[in-house]
Curated annotation (Swiss-Prot):
Protein name as catalogued: Uncharacterized protein C26F1.08c
Keyword flag Glycoprotein: yes
PANTHER family: 60S RIBOSOMAL PROTEIN L19, PROTEIN BRE4
Residues bearing carbohydrate: 210, 262, 265, 300, 346, 364, 496, 773, 926, 969
Keywords recorded for this protein, A-Z: Glycoprotein, Membrane, Transmembrane, Transmembrane helix
Ranges that cross the membrane: 24-44, 54-74, 83-103, 108-128, 164-184, 376-396, 585-605, 616-636, 656-676, 682-702, 717-737, 857-877
UniProt cross-references to InterPro entries, sorted A to Z: ALMT, ArAE_2_N, Brefeldin_A-sensitivity_4, IVT-Associated
Record's bilayer topology term: Multi-pass membrane protein
Chief location of this protein within or outside the cell: membrane
Annotated Gene Ontology cellular component terms: endoplasmic reticulum; membrane
Record's signal peptide: none
Localization (cell): Membrane
Keyword Transmembrane attached: yes
Length: 977
């Protein structure tokens, strides 16, 4: 029996390895076949003679400008851009060459015309590439001009090979790649890529749901707070990272299908409708994971405080949710600021010891509501599996899901949604029954005793949110089922992928922070205010009282000079601030400096003999936006050039010029190079390798070079490194664009957007119309996510820069990126919670508590601004920071006092006419407070989310302080001494 089980396990592992290797084989089949087809075409000598002097450029065009893409539509988009770049580059080169040859025939010098035209083309193409994209179009344009304009700049006539030497290789490579894309399996359509990415994302959501349910309540054996909490916290971070990465993969799949060339049962534009639903489910699932970890922390904290002795040592606020102040006097102090050390060490946590039966209470409560959690999670998991099956049916030919089963699942989720209010009321009734002072509202006096109940309720609330979003997904899939065709059809369209209209919401200003004086001061300074507060000068002339002749001459001249100064300021401001202009100037200067050798009479012949165009091409592909990217790409290009040159010389010596041996060797190495290019992070090395050995190996085979392969390989390596060195020098000297600086800028912009997002939510809360816009808030979150994605990429490049200020804190920056992303997510969750506020709750916990609300809003807004200012300008963190946690507690205790005032002790009846503005008159007579606990529970959920935001804010500020090099604050004892 053991042998049988062992054999079965070995067979399963063997099948897994076979499936893995077969998937890699099929993924490499297309690029290898395309590369081998281009190699065979180059080896045909009659065809090579007709192509011109550079037949090996077929391989260069294929590798650089026609790479195999994931989908057919993306492949034809690349081919279209490259062909357009070929047309523009050849046209630009021909026109420039006509002017240069005309100057040479008329006893002039046409080389300055060629040099100027090449620099101008470099600037325009680099600017378009940096600002608008179209990467393949821009690169192939300047690539062709680098070859055409540096060949014999002093000739007086244009040879016929000038027109076709680069056009034929481009067309041949495009044709080969097009045929391979269509004919060689597997042929992936856009719907296949998007559908598979969506199915993978649903699998990740189901895994996260299983994890949160399995860890809904830990076992009794896990009594260690530090070890078990750290392990569980790491697991939660891993699941959050997996969810984020799978959602990013789905976004990438949608983006790669911008031009849809699709032959399937459903269009990509139909599948794109799933994107907002997936985002909301991911958001709800992230909140559910956070609630699960909160529940786990509460359980461990109840064990941690279940002891007779007070706990000594530092307690991190980030490990806990709320803590009571030491006394009622401290509670009622509405201090806006608190010292820095209270962000980390909170002595009030030792003020009260947890009740000894807290562990038993939370065990009993979890057992009481575990059946609800088990039923809901099972239904949600079954619904996600059903959504997975329906989506799989949309993109492939599998068994159809009956509509009755889908409707039954939707009705079950709807029934669960309708039971939310009753279950929340039951939970709070349980909390009040556990207290000894129900009638005088004493349950809120011992809020620590009820923390377990509230945390379990918070967990259930987020589970209800997940169920609601899954129900919306099923409703959408029910509508999308009608969009599926019984037979595959051809879809071809281009749809807009803009996620957020930046201009629409660009006018949202933070007047409370940007205004440095009050309204009264503004009235006093009205007459002394400048003409234009934005920094630009006014074009309109002043009304003059003096009408003399000198004034009539002087003031128009002054106005004209002021206007010209303003235009010059705008040009300078645009040049200095625009990343696109800076990149274009760097590209033009780099290529212009290297092309000087090609346009000098004394060095032009040697330049062509040395194959010096490759130094220009190296500058083209190495000179990136940031210095660190230039160093990284330059290193990859050096390694790729070295390996390609060594391989070309070795292959020539082994093959001895035999075409079949050359084809065999190149076909074998194609598998290795394509694997490195498409399945590893060293794709830059493989790309340069594929364009390095053809000029050396095939040049010797076709007798296009008069020098030996060894010398050609050495010269190629030297000129490429000359281009790399020039690119590095230009990028450092001309507008240095450092990854560290850009990284800090991106993080500062993300924190500023978080500030705008919170101020927008505060405006909604304090407005009278109870208006909450989910679109604007989620749009801010998408912008934050986009900035943080760029920050993650830059974080991988900072170590490539010249390190003059010591080691770069990569780990701290990574933690800061995670916290900023969590802030964006939790602000969206806060907006979604507030969107459920009704009129009763609004007047009860918002309008009557407006002063406490303003304290909390001011404290959090100032904290957000301190975070933004410290990141952007490296400003030191003030010793006294806004006391967000204290303001939050003051608000909670104020709500408690309001509840006491409105509660009648005889029978627990809500008083009629109580409260301000006659709000309670709208409440029905004999309406108990307990059935209305849904309102209070939404308030608790809001406070819980705000508490998480405060925790992330405090931790982010501590990270920024460490990044800025500020010293850690001393302990309380040293401060008191």
């Amino acid at each position: 029996m053991n042998f049988h089980h062992g054999w079965t396990f070995h067979k399963l592992r063997k099948n897994e390895h076979f499936l893995k290797y077969s998937a890699i084989f099929y993924s490499l089949l297309k690029p290898v076949v395309a590369l081998f087809a281009c190699q065979c075409l180059v080896l045909i000598r009659p065809l090579a003679r007709k192509i011109g002097s550079f037949p090996f450029l077929i391989l260069t065009f294929h590798t650089l400008f026609y790479p195999i893409q994931n989908t057919v539509g993306a492949q034809f988009e690349v081919i279209g851009q490259s062909l357009m770049g070929t047309a523009v580059g050849v046209t630009w080169g021909i026109i420039t060459k006509l002017f240069a040859t005309a100057a040479n025939r008329n006893h002039g010098d046409g080389s300055p015309i060629l040099a100027t035209s090449l620099a101008l083309a470099s600037f325009i193409s680099a600017y378009i590439r940096s600002r608008y994209g179209y990467r393949f179009f821009c690169i192939i344009w300047i690539f062709i001009d680098c070859f055409l304009l540096t060949r014999d700049p002093f000739e007086k006539t244009i040879a016929k090979s000038f027109y076709i030497s680069l056009v034929y290789p481009s067309l041949i490579a495009a044709g080969v790649v097009s045929l391979v894309t269509i004919l060689v399996p597997p042929m992936r359509m856009a719907s296949d890529l998007v559908g598979q990415s969506g199915l993978d994302h649903l699998n990740k959501i189901m895994q996260s749901l299983n994890f949160s349910v399995e860890n809904f309540f830990p076992s009794d054996e896990s009594v260690s707070f530090s070890s078990s909490s750290s392990v569980i916290k790491r697991m939660f971070k891993e699941h959050e990272s997996v969810l984020r990465n799978s959602m990013d993969d789905f976004h990438t799949a949608i983006s790669s299908s911008e031009i849809e060339l699709n032959y399937s049962n459903v269009s990509v534009s139909t599948l794109k409708l799933l994107e907002p639903k997936f985002e909301r489910i991911t958001l709800a699932m992230s909140a559910q994971l956070a609630a699960s970890f909160t529940l786990y922390e509460t359980y461990n904290f109840s064990i941690y405080k279940n002891q007779d002795k007070e706990v000594e040592g530092d307690i991190r606020v980030s490990e806990l949710r709320f803590s009571l102040p030491e006394s009622t006097e401290v509670q009622q102090k509405r201090n806006i600021f608190t010292p820095q050390y209270q962000l980390h060490i909170n002595g009030s946590l030792r003020a009260k010891v947890r009740p000894k039966d807290s562990k038993d209470r939370i065990v009993n409560l979890s057992n009481l509501y575990f059946s609800n959690v088990d039923h809901m999670s099972s239904l949600i998991l079954g619904s996600l599996k059903l959504a997975h099956a329906i989506m799989k049916w949309l993109v492939s030919d599998v068994e159809h899901i009956p509509d009755e089963r889908l409707r039954e699942c939707i009705e079950s989720l709807q029934e669960i949604d309708s039971k939310e209010e009753n279950l929340m009321t039951e939970i709070f009734c349980t909390a009040f029954k556990e207290t000894k002072k129900v009638n005088d509202f004493g349950g809120f006096e011992e809020i620590e005793d009820e923390e377990e109940v509230l945390v379990i309720a918070y967990y259930l609330f987020n589970l209800f949110e997940v169920a609601r979003e899954v129900k919306n997904l099923l409703l959408l899939l029910e509508g999308l089922k009608a969009q599926r065709h019984n037979k595959p059809k051809l879809f071809f369209r281009k749809f807009n992928l803009s996620l957020f209209d930046k201009q629409k919401y660009a006018n949202y200003a933070i007047s409370a922070l940007l205004t440095h004086f009050t309204a009264g001061d503004a009235d006093k300074c009205d007459d002394e205010a400048p003409d234009d507060a934005s920094g630009e000068e006014d074009d309109s002339p002043k009304v003059l009282n003096d009408q003399s002749f000198f004034d009539s001459v002087r003031y128009p001249l002054k106005f004209f000079l002021r206007k010209m100064r303003r235009k010059c300021w705008r040009v300078y401001h645009f040049t200095a601030r625009s990343k696109d202009v800076r990149y274009g100037l760097k590209m033009a200067i780099g290529i212009g400096l290297l092309s000087i050798v090609a346009f000098q009479k004394s060095t032009a012949a040697r330049y062509t003999l040395w194959n010096g165009q490759w130094s220009l091409i190296s500058t083209l592909f190495v000179l990136e936006v940031t210095v660190s990217t230039t160093l990284r790409v330059g290193l990859f290009r050096t390694l790729g050039t070295l390996s390609g040159a060594v391989y070309a010389y070795a292959a020539w010596e082994v093959s001895q010029g035999w075409s079949y041996a050359i084809a065999t060797l190149t076909f074998a190495i194609s598998w290795v190079s394509c694997y490195v290019k498409y399945n590893t992070e060293y794709s830059g090395i493989a790309t340069v390798f594929n364009i390095t050995f053809p000029p050396i190996l095939y040049g010797s085979y076709l007798k296009t070079s008069t020098i030996s392969p060894f010398h050609l390989a050495c010269i190629r390596f030297i000129v490429v490194n000359v281009g790399i060195g020039m690119a590095i020098v230009v990028n450092i000297v001309v507008f240095p664009y450092l990854a560290r600086r850009v990284l800090k800028y991106k993080l500062g912009q993300a924190s500023l957007l978080s500030l705008k997002q919170y101020t927008t939510l505060s405006d909604y809360l304090l407005s009278r119309n109870l208006y909450t816009n989910l679109t604007i808030c989620e749009g801010y979150k998408k912008q934050i996510s986009s900035l943080l994605v760029t920050a993650r990429k830059l974080l991988q490049l900072v170590n490539m820069e010249f390190n003059l200020k010591g080691p770069f804190p990569v780990g701290i920056y990574n933690d800061l990126i995670i916290k900023l992303e969590n802030l964006g997510i939790r602000l969206v969750v806060l907006n979604r919670v507030r969107s459920r506020f009704g009129l009763y709750l609004y007047y009860d916990v918002v309008k009557n508590m407006i002063d406490y609300r303003k304290d909390l809003i001011v404290s959090m807004t100032l904290t957000f601004y301190i975070l933004y200012n410290s990141i952007m300008s490296k400003a030191p963190i003030p010793y006294f920071v806004p006391s967000c946690r204290q303001a939050l507690w003051n608000l909670r205790l104020a709500i408690e006092e309001e509840g006491k005032r409105r509660f009648v002790t005889n029978g627990g009846i809500l008083a009629q006419g109580a409260g301000s503005d006659g709000v309670a008159k709208d409440v029905p007579e004999n309406h108990s407070w307990l059935p209305a606990q849904k309102n209070f529970f939404l308030y608790y959920v809001e406070c819980q989310v705000i508490g998480d935001i405060v925790t992330d804010l405090e931790y982010s500020i501590s990270l920024v302080r460490r990044i800025n090099g500020e010293k850690e604050n001393e302990t309380i004892g040293k401060k008191m001494a």
